[in-house]
Amino acid sequence: MADVTGIALGMIETRGLVPAIEAADAMTKAAEVRLVGRQFVGGGYVTVLVRGETGAVNAAVRAGADACERVGDGLVAAHIIARVHSEVENILPKAPQA
């Protein structure tokens, strides 16, 4: 039996910081999600991660991808994992404490 969490993970990868900031802003405004953080992948790529209920993460990632595309050719990928396996949790950045 897989050990999974009930919290979804949304990821948007961009070319550059400006599209990443635009995507993060749109995602957090569009739905009840928590911004987990951003990762500088290298070569100018930035990945923004959000967590929340699956429906909210879906809406947030859609809004973030749309916003990122309005900035230019910044969107590289957008992906959602509905139920993250507990072992994957260990490699994710920790959410900032409120």
UniProtKB/Swiss-Prot annotation:
Predominant location category: other
Record's GO cellular component terms: carboxysome
Molecular function (Gene Ontology), one example: structural constituent of carboxysome shell
Gene Ontology biological-process annotations: carbon fixation
Outcome of gene disruption: Does not grow in ambient air, has a wild-type growth rate in 5% CO(2), called a high-CO(2) requiring phenotype, hcr. Fewer carboxysomes are present, RuBisCO is found to be soluble rather than in the carboxysome. Required for growth in ambient air.
Domain named BMC: residues: 8-93
Entry-linked InterPro entries: Bact_microcomp_CS, BMC_dom, BMC_shell, CcmK-like_sf, CcmK/CsoS1_BMC
Origin: domain of life: Bacteria
Tagged with keyword Ribosomal protein: no
SMART domains for the chain: BMC (SM00877)
Keywords, comma-separated and alphabetical: Bacterial microcompartment, Carbon dioxide fixation, Carboxysome
Practical use: Expression of 10 genes for alpha-carboxysome (Cb) proteins (cbbL-cbbS-csoS2-csoS3-csoS4A-csoS4B-csoS1C-csoS1A-csoS1B-csoS1D) in E.coli generates compartments that resemble Cb, contain RuBisCO and have its catalytic activity, showing it is possible to make artificial, functional Cb using these 10 genes. Cargo proteins can be targeted to these organelles. Artificial Cb assembly in E.coli requires csoS2-csoS4A-csoS4B-csoS1C-csoS1A-csoS1B-csoS1D (but not the gene for carbonic anhydrase, csoS3).
Localisation per UniProt entry: Carboxysome
Keyword check for Ion transport: no
Recorded domain comment: The tight homohexamer forms a pore with an opening of about 4 Angstroms in diameter which is positively charged.
Task of the protein: The major shell protein of the carboxysome, a polyhedral inclusion where RuBisCO (ribulose bisphosphate carboxylase, ccbL-ccbS) is sequestered. Assembles into hexamers which make sheets that form the facets of the polyhedral carboxysome. The shell probably limits the diffusion of CO(2) into and out of the carboxysome. Molecular modeling shows the central pore of this protein is selectively permeable to anions such as HCO(3) rather than CO(2) or O(2). There are estimated to be 2970 CsoS1A/CsoS1C proteins per carboxysome (the proteins differ by only 1 residue).
Family to which the UniProt record says this protein belongs: Belongs to the bacterial microcompartments protein family. CsoS1 subfamily.
Complexes and interactors: Homohexamer with a small central pore; the concave side is mostly positive electrostatic potential, whereas the convex side is mostly negative electrostatic potential. Forms a CsoS2-CsoS1-RuBisCO complex. Interacts with the N-terminus (residues 1-136) of RuBisCO (CbbL).
The name this protein goes by in its record: Major carboxysome shell protein CsoS1A
Origin species: Halothiobacillus neapolitanus (strain ATCC 23641 / c2) (Thiobacillus neapolitanus)
Name of the gene this protein is made from: csoS1A
